Amino acid sequence: MRQTKTGILLANLGTPDAPTPEAVKRYLKQFLSDRRVVDTSRLLWWPLLRGVILPLRSPRVAKLYASVWMEGGSPLMVYSRQQQQALAQRLPETPVALGMSYGSPSLESAVDELLAEHVDHIVVLPLYPQYSCSTVGAVWDELARILARKRSIPGISFIRDYADNHDYINALANSVRASFAKHGEPDLLLLSYHGIPQRYADEGDDYPQRCRTTTRELASALEMAPEKVMMTFQSRFGREPWLMPYTDETLKMLGEKGVGHIQVMCPGFAADCLETLEEIAEQNREVFLGAGGKKYEYIPALNATPEHIEMMANLVAAYR
């Protein structure tokens, strides 16, 4: 029987190369051109994207990136590299590559890196705990395009998601417990997930169900009463309805109703990024406190913590 050599491909969304309008424009153009992300008619979308959205949004988004930029790059890139390196140390006999759907390093460069290591089987782990067509589906599409250009393709194991994985839920629960121990138990734990258009869910994307699964399992692991855990959706874009309730509107409502202390976690983000460090930790903190809230803490993503890396190692082991 032929010996198989397995490699691991960690996939995530991507990030601009620099906190500048030019770099952000390049990144947003690639990201917002993907039909998995925006499936509007190209005849309508292209003029809007190129003539309005990119010129207006790029300078503003670049300033937001600059506010969270780290010495080694964007937070997503820094933490993703740390995850790759830590998993490679945990699995020293297994090549581990990092690829992004948009920007650098690309998914194609990650596949080529693994093939250069003479692997004949790749375990693809999209770092999106809850499946969505706009994230995991985009990785699948790009991987298929990459392999379509190869004369010889490796065996592929593709991990769809891990919304209810035991190690993942335990890692989240331990992170919440540590935050409660540090800041005191809040009146409410708010779990904020990235939103998608409601239409995508209506057409069959089971993302909201996967988010509810994670929320239910995490609340159970924490032994918290259902009324003390709330699920919301953030980062909506455009005019059509997205999954509700919206995070910012919910925080405003809670502050106005007299809820004093809230802690917020984003279980759908495997690594901290602009949407967690700026939108949730800063913007939404101001929303809650401005509406009358008293205490607000953001619970960081799992990033490259030992528990998270162990979870990844155990997850890919089942597919090797």
Curated annotation (Swiss-Prot):
Catalytic activity: heme b + 2 H(+) = protoporphyrin IX + Fe(2+)
Chief subcellular location: cytoplasm
GO-annotated biological processes: heme biosynthetic process
Record's subunit section: Monomer.
Domain of life: Bacteria
Compartments it resides in: Cytoplasm
Cellular component terms per the entry's GO annotation: cytoplasm
Gene Ontology molecular function, alphabetical: ferrochelatase activity; metal ion binding
Similarity comment: family membership: Belongs to the ferrochelatase family.
EC number(s) recorded for this UniProt protein: 4.98.1.1
CDD domains: Ferrochelatase_C, Ferrochelatase_N
Signal peptide feature range: none
Keyword tRNA-binding carried by entry: no
Primary role: Catalyzes the ferrous insertion into protoporphyrin IX.
Source organism (scientific name): Escherichia coli O6:H1 (strain CFT073 / ATCC 700928 / UPEC)
The UniProt record lists the keyword Lipid metabolism: no
Binding positions (Fe cation): 194, 275
Protein name from the UniProt record: Ferrochelatase
Alphabetized UniProt keyword annotations: Cytoplasm, Heme biosynthesis, Iron, Lyase, Metal-binding, Porphyrin biosynthesis
Pathway terms, separated by semicolons: Porphyrin-containing compound metabolism; protoheme biosynthesis; protoheme from protoporphyrin-IX: step 1/1
InterPro entries in UniProt: Ferrochelatase (IPR001015), Ferrochelatase_AS (IPR019772), Ferrochelatase_C (IPR033644), Ferrochelatase_N (IPR033659)
